[in-house]
Amino acid sequence: MKSTQPAKVLTEQRKFLDQFASLPFDDRAADEYGRIRAHLARHGTPIGPNDLLIAAIALANNATLVTHNMAEFNRVPGLTITDWETPA
């Protein structure tokens, strides 16, 4: 659905996203990316390239990844994951 007020939608989106930190894909994340990709390839359990980027950034920053995509991210060794749909 296209908005009739794209400027307003963009402003609201920016307000929402400003509440969160954005972590970069830096050298540490690139190293993690290679390590994870090689490990998963050796075990025949690859994950999608975007999920691989997300996992690498989380590991490089020692961050907990909050997701409902447990099937993919459970394959990544050392990654701390929380399912946002599971009650605490």
Give short role names for the model-derived ranges:
Residues 1-56, 80, 85-88:
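PIN-domain endoribonuclease scaffold, especially VapC-family toxins
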Residues 60, 64, 68-73:
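C-terminal structural segments of small proteins and small subunits
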